[in-house]
């Protein structure tokens, strides 16, 4: 068995973004005021919803998502 066969398939950034957006939409409803940043890190996909207006109070959700299963490992809401 080759190494490639042993590795689990990784989710694409689009798939991960869909998971994060579904959860964020339930919590925040209007996501238009956020810029979304996504990066693959050693502990999973990091998806951050940051306010476009730096002077506004509050913030958006922040996620770490498992790259294989798409499960939200951690989430933090700033409101």
Give the residues covered by each predicted segment.
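Long, terminal "pre-/pro-" and other extracytoplasmic accessory regions
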Residues: 1-79
């Amino acid at each position: 068995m080759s190494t490639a066969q042993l590795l689990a398939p990784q989710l694409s950034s689009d798939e991960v973004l869909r998971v994060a957006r579904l959860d964020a939409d339930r919590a925040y409803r209007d996501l238009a005021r956020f810029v979304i940043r996504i990066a693959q890190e050693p502990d999973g996909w990091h998806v951050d919803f940051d306010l476009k207006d730096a002077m506004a109070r509050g913030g958006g959700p922040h996620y770490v998502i498992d790259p294989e299963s798409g499960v939200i490992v951690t989430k933090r809401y700033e409101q």
